[in-house]
Amino acid sequence: MNNPNQPVSYPIFTVRWLAIHAIGIPAVFFIGSITAMQFIQR
Protein backbone atom coordinates (compact mmCIF):
# COMPACT_ATOMS: atom_id res chain seq x y z
CA MET A 1 0.00 0.00 0.00
CA ASN A 2 3.01 2.29 0.53
CA ASN A 3 4.57 2.31 -2.96
CA PRO A 4 6.76 5.33 -3.77
CA ASN A 5 7.09 3.99 -7.33
CA GLN A 6 3.45 4.89 -8.07
CA PRO A 7 2.76 8.31 -6.48
CA VAL A 8 0.04 9.03 -9.05
CA SER A 9 -2.24 6.16 -8.05
CA TYR A 10 -2.60 7.27 -4.42
CA PRO A 11 -3.86 10.86 -4.98
CA ILE A 12 -6.21 9.79 -7.79
CA PHE A 13 -7.74 7.08 -5.61
CA THR A 14 -8.11 9.51 -2.69
CA VAL A 15 -9.71 12.21 -4.86
CA ARG A 16 -12.05 9.69 -6.46
CA TRP A 17 -13.14 8.27 -3.07
CA LEU A 18 -13.61 11.77 -1.67
CA ALA A 19 -15.62 12.92 -4.68
CA ILE A 20 -17.86 9.84 -4.60
CA HIS A 21 -18.60 10.34 -0.91
CA ALA A 22 -19.03 14.12 -1.24
CA ILE A 23 -21.50 13.68 -4.12
CA GLY A 24 -23.21 10.48 -2.95
CA ILE A 25 -24.24 11.58 0.55
CA PRO A 26 -25.94 14.87 -0.50
CA ALA A 27 -27.49 13.13 -3.52
CA VAL A 28 -29.15 10.52 -1.28
CA PHE A 29 -30.34 13.28 1.06
CA PHE A 30 -31.70 15.30 -1.87
CA ILE A 31 -33.52 12.30 -3.36
CA GLY A 32 -35.00 11.43 0.04
CA SER A 33 -36.19 15.01 0.51
CA ILE A 34 -37.80 15.08 -2.94
CA THR A 35 -39.58 11.75 -2.36
CA ALA A 36 -40.80 12.95 1.05
CA MET A 37 -42.19 16.16 -0.45
CA GLN A 38 -43.94 14.20 -3.20
CA PHE A 39 -45.50 11.87 -0.63
CA ILE A 40 -46.61 14.81 1.53
CA GLN A 41 -48.16 16.62 -1.45
CA ARG A 42 -50.04 13.48 -2.44
Curated annotation (Swiss-Prot):
Its main location: plastid. InterPro entries: PSII_cyt_b559_bsu, PSII_cyt_b559_CS, PSII_cyt_b559_N. This is Cytochrome b559 subunit beta. Belongs to the PsbE/PsbF family. The keyword Transmembrane helix applies. Its cofactor is heme b. Heterodimer of an alpha subunit and a beta subunit. PSII is composed of 1 copy each of membrane proteins PsbA, PsbB, PsbC, PsbD, PsbE, PsbF, PsbH, PsbI, PsbJ, PsbK, PsbL, PsbM, PsbT, PsbX, PsbY, PsbZ, Psb30/Ycf12, at least 3 peripheral proteins of the oxygen-evolving complex and a large number of cofactors. It forms dimeric complexes. The keyword DNA-binding does not apply. GO terms for biological process: photosynthetic electron transport chain. With its partner (PsbE) binds heme. PSII binds additional chlorophylls, carotenoids and specific lipids. It holds the Pfam family Cytochrom_B559. PROSITE patterns: CYTOCHROME_B559. It is found in: Plastid, Cyanelle thylakoid membrane.
